[in-house]
Amino acid sequence: MRALILGGTAESRELALLLLQSGWRVTSSLAGRVKEPKLPLGEVRIGGFGGPPGLARWLMDHEVDLVVDATHPFAEKISISAAEATRATGIPLIALHRPAWTPENYDEWIYVNDMEEAARKAERYHHIFLTIGRQKLAPFANDSHNLYVIRSVDPPEGPLPKRHRLILSRGPFSVQDEKQLMRDNQIDALVTKNSGGSL
């Protein structure tokens, strides 16, 4: 039996190991957005498939029996491609979904529709912690008054805020370390994507 795991997450690496231990032949596919990704066990391919038709062709050419979508919750394109390709080929698809984080008492969450709106809302604060990845930072570049602490696995793309501190680091991060980072930088706002997961 052969499985294709659409991955790049901790859950996808854990699943690759479990399937390999159960006797499956596993290929994990990574988008290629991180320069030095954590690689799962088994075969690994990096890069796109060429949309749903390319993925469907790859699935048939490699005689895949099961596709598992274990991508990041905001990786919408590949999830759509996987759904269309498996529907076209009749190959079963399992999608792993992390439970979203939920606010606790005294949390002050502000929901926004996009990064442009997030940038407008962030300007009312003074020390903003950005954990949104390296590709969506441009909307924050126009704010020259506030300090932005930006954490990313790889160096960011595009313009950055005039006042910023860049932290190149890869998680997972402990709650204790996150609290210390926020205290050390006097963070009064966090901009993040609700990608869920355990705390």
Task: Briefly describe each language-model feature range.
Residues 115-149:
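Internal active-site segments that recognize and position negatively charged phosphoryl groups
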Residues 27-50, 105-108, 159-165:
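N-terminal beta-loop-helix "entrance" segment that forms/cooperates
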Residues 28-36, 96-102, 115, 134-136, ...:
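Short, polar loop motifs at secondary-structure junctions
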Residues 42-59, 167-177:
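Glycine-rich, highly charged phosphate/nucleotide-binding loops
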Residues 158-199:
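A C-terminal functional module that forms or caps the active site or interfaces directly
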Residues 139-171:
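Histidine/lysine/aspartate-rich catalytic loop segments that bind and position anionic ligands
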Residues 3-32:
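N-terminal basic/disordered segments at the start of proteins
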Residues 55-115:
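Glycine/small-residue-rich loop that forms an oxyanion/phosphate-binding "nest" at active or ligand-binding sites
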